Curated annotation (Swiss-Prot):
Phosphoserine: modified positions: S32, S35, S39, S48, S50, S53, S55
One Gene Ontology biological process: galactose metabolic process
PANTHER family for the chain: GALACTOSE TRANSPORTER-RELATED, PLASTIDIC GLUCOSE TRANSPORTER 4
Residues annotated as signal peptide: none
Disordered: annotated span: 1-57
Entry protein name: Galactose transporter
Cytoplasmic membrane side: 1-70, 143-149, 197-207, 264-342, 388-394, 457-472, 521-574
Residue ranges crossing the lipid bilayer per the database entry: 71-91, 122-142, 150-170, 176-196, 208-228, 243-263, 343-362, 367-387, 395-415, 436-456, 473-493, 500-520
Record carries keyword Phosphoprotein: yes
GO molecular function: carbohydrate:proton symporter activity; D-glucose transmembrane transporter activity; galactose transmembrane transporter activity
Broad class of where this protein is predominantly found: membrane
Keywords linked to the UniProt accession: Membrane, Phosphoprotein, Sugar transport, Transmembrane, Transmembrane helix, Transport
Length: 574
């Protein structure tokens, strides 16, 4: 524990232990002599000072937001990977009802019309998620082997191969199916490496907002995908679906080109002993000189964490299940948060929005999909404020509660009012409009809470040595549940129709309680401070009162944050 207690460059707790660690690290670490001297001087001052005195850590000062335009744009370039995921979500919902797509990859009714069976629809839509799950686990390793930037370029190239196979499909649905698996492999790697790189290059006070830009790009992709489908639906040939797929080449080339401008992760650079490059990366992200003492302090903080992890040996898959280091608890949290993001029911609307709104009697369901896309995209801008100002826990709790209310109304109207004279008769236009309105409310609540925060939590919760593995498994949970929902939704809605909304309502109730008891607040903490929060065993519902060891006073009561004698229901009411 001595090493981890001194992850901060300046430590005012347990001075003797801190001095021993700095001494041991200095033998063959990259901690600067200046920072080692500074740390020892501070420790001695802490020993000789009066009771109640504490040292002040060197931190990179916050600047006006105008100073962070460059790093924000660079993070947006990385976040553009989410656009490719969103583009697929937005376009595939239209493909499955387009005439040329049905003629080429569907089956024929006796009357000569073409259709996709529920099984084939589910497979074509959902298999992408299975590819993503494996891509996140397998291809994300490139981020550890070659660096985050090169790793991203590799997975984008895999995505391009999948798109080529899909475009080349003529009338064999299984060829298109294989292409979706391969493009899914690429997007799965993107979904791990993009949030990871953003979380490692962003200033800590902007990390939540900038990681949320990944979700912003997903929503932009969904919206523009809907718009493109609307623009091509009037064609009668393969332009309907090949043009949207062809545009994927432009997005991929832009992504690869933009990555050349982005700084590499300083944590990765430190891990491969490129310390000077890491210093320049930190300085570029924070708009300060590489010679600034605060940059060196940040570098030393990262190096101390890496040195401690090296002492523990190489990370293995088995270590992910260690309860001693709290990695397993964090992995479970990441898996559950990503699973619950899917069980909110968002992809019920995004994947099958065109089909759903056709069933409520709308003449042009493509137009309604565009409305949903606009609401989703615009709402995500608001999420950039909510993530940092409300905090991560409050966002998740508030989102679960409000989405539950919207889903109850949506399902209840669909079950009781949509077909007042039976399904053989026309649907009620008023009930259909009501369902669309509450669908938009639901999407607003989702886009401002669970959509971005799930990725933020996954990107910042794991130690560096096991980060890619943990993020891959957590993301795989998202993709697997996305597959299950996308594949089984046609069957479930055929059997129970809008009662399906009550299933998601139950999931939203469960996730509210899960977040309250198992997800701590990490807003405004550095990645190393989040590590300390977990190691100290702070109760999630008390985590907002936790202060890192480097900033505590002598009267700080840590034990009160680690225990709670009140019944659970009283803890929730406080």
């Amino acid at each position: 524990m001595a090493v981890e207690e001194n992850n901060m460059p300046v430590v005012s707790q347990q001075p003797q232990a801190g001095e021993d660690v700095i001494s041991s690290l200095s033998k063959d670490s990259h901690l600067s002599a200046q920072s080692q001297k500074y740390s020892n001087d501070e420790l001695k001052a802490g020993e000789s000072g009066s009771e109640g005195s504490q040292s002040v850590p060197i931190e990179i000062p916050k600047k006006p937001m105008s100073e962070y335009v460059t790093v924000s744009l660079l993070c947006l370039c990385v976040a553009f990977g989410g656009f490719m995921f969103g583009w697929d979500t937005g376009t595939i919902s239209g493909f499955v009802v387009q005439t040329d797509f049905l003629r080429r990859f569907g089956m024929k009714h006796k009357d000569g019309t073409h259709y996709l069976s529920n099984v084939r629809t589910g497979l074509i839509v959902a298999i992408f998620n299975i590819g993503c799950a494996f891509g996140g686990i397998i291809l994300s390793k490139g981020g550890d082997m070659y660096g985050r930037k090169k790793g991203l370029s590799i997975v984008v190239s895999v995505y391009i191969v999948g798109i080529i196979i899909q475009i080349a499909s003529i009338n064999k649905w299984y060829q298109y199916f294989i292409g979706r698996i391969i493009s899914g492999l690429g997007v799965g790697g993107i979904a791990v490496l993009c949030p990871m790189l953003i979380s490692e290059i962003a200033p800590k006070h902007l990390r939540g907002t900038l990681v949320s830009c990944y979700q912003l790009m997903i929503t932009a992709g969904i919206f523009l995908g809907y718009c493109t489908n609307y623009g091509t639906k009037s064609y009668s040939n393969s332009v309907q679906w090949r043009v949207p797929l062809g545009l994927c080449f432009a997005w991929s080339l832009f992504m690869i080109g933009a990555l050349t401008l982005v700084p590499e992760s300083p944590r990765y650079l430190c891990e491969v002993n490129k310390v000077e490059d890491a210093k320049r990366s930190i300085a570029k992200s924070n708009k300060v000189s590489p010679e600034d003492p605060a940059v060196q302090a940040e570098l030393d903080l990262i190096m101390a964490g890496i040195e401690a992890e090296k002492l523990a040996g190489n990370a293995s898959w088995g270590e992910l299940f260690s309860t001693k280091t709290k990695v397993f608890q964090r992995l479970l949290m990441g898996v559950f948060v990503q699973m619950f993001q899917q069980l909110t029911g968002n992809n019920y609307f995004f994947y099958y929005g065109t089909v759903i709104f056709k069933s409520v009697g709308l003449d042009d369901s493509f137009e309604t999909s565009i409305v949903i896309g606009v609401v989703n995209f615009a709402s995500t801008f608001f999420s950039l404020w909510t993530v940092e100002n409300l905090g991560h826990r409050k966002c998740l709790l508030l989102g679960a509660a409000t989405m539950m209310a919207c889903m109850v109304i949506y399902a209840s109207v669909g079950v009781t009012r949509l077909y007042p004279h039976g399904k053989s008769q026309p649907s009620s236009k008023g009930a259909g409009n009501c369902m669309i309105v509450f669908t938009c409310f639901y999407i607003f609540c989702y886009a401002t809470t669970w959509a971005p925060v799930a990725w933020v939590i996954t990107a910042e919760s794991f130690p560096l040595r096991v980060k890619s593995k943990c993020m891959a498994l957590a993301s795989a949970s998202n993709w697997v549940w996305g597959f299950l929902i996308a594949f089984f939704t046609p069957f479930i809605t055929s059997a129970i129709n809008f009662y399906y909304g009550y299933v998601f309502m139950g999931c939203l109730v469960a996730m509210f309680f899960y977040v309250f008891f198992f997800v701590p607040e990490t807003k405004g903490l550095s990645l190393e401070e989040i590590q300390e929060l977990w190691e100290e065993g702070v109760l999630p519902w008390k985590s907002e009162g936790w202060i890192p060891s480097s900033r505590r006073g002598n009267n700080y009561d840590l034990e009160d944050l680690q225990h709670d004698d009140k019944p659970w229901y009283k803890a929730m009411l406080e």
